[in-house]
Amino acid sequence: RMFQDLSSFNQDIRDWVVSNVQNMSGMFQDATSFNQDIGGWNVSKVTNMSKIFMDAKDFNQDIGNWIVSDVIQMDQMFKNAVSFNQDIGNWNTTKVTNMGGMFRDATSFNQDVSKWDVSMVTNMQFMFDSSDLSSDNYDKLLTAWSQLTLKQAVVFTLGAVTYCNAAEARESMITTYKWRITDGGLDCSNLG
């Protein structure tokens, strides 16, 4: 939790060697001014990214090329990171078990994460609650994830996020895997 609660911290640390770090939990939590390029960091050995950018209100850097294939914990990773809206759709999430609250209150986040392999995830409670996830991106997510072999009885909470074209996929996840999905319901009024 190196920079936790350092609200004014915003130094250039792009050249830091973090290739042996395994736990980044809470690293930038409450570092409300931090917004530096760390997209080149080698995070391939990290297993815990829980709360890494929680309450990092200014952070909005491209970390889409991070190798997160060993990460197990992503819970509350971007919680209340109100500026973050970067493409992280190509992340390898095959080992992740906890995505609870990952984008909760991340009020700018609206990206396509439908390529994520969430077959090991057991907790998605409040994952997209009060995020800015669009119906289109939610539809893509439901359509893709319904094709995976998922864990049973996962709680998946999205607040007011609505779906339109993926009603069948959503129902399949509920019927086949007993997922408990809480969202804003069916709404196709925003389609152009």
Predicted regions and their residues:
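Negatively charged
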Residues: R1-G192
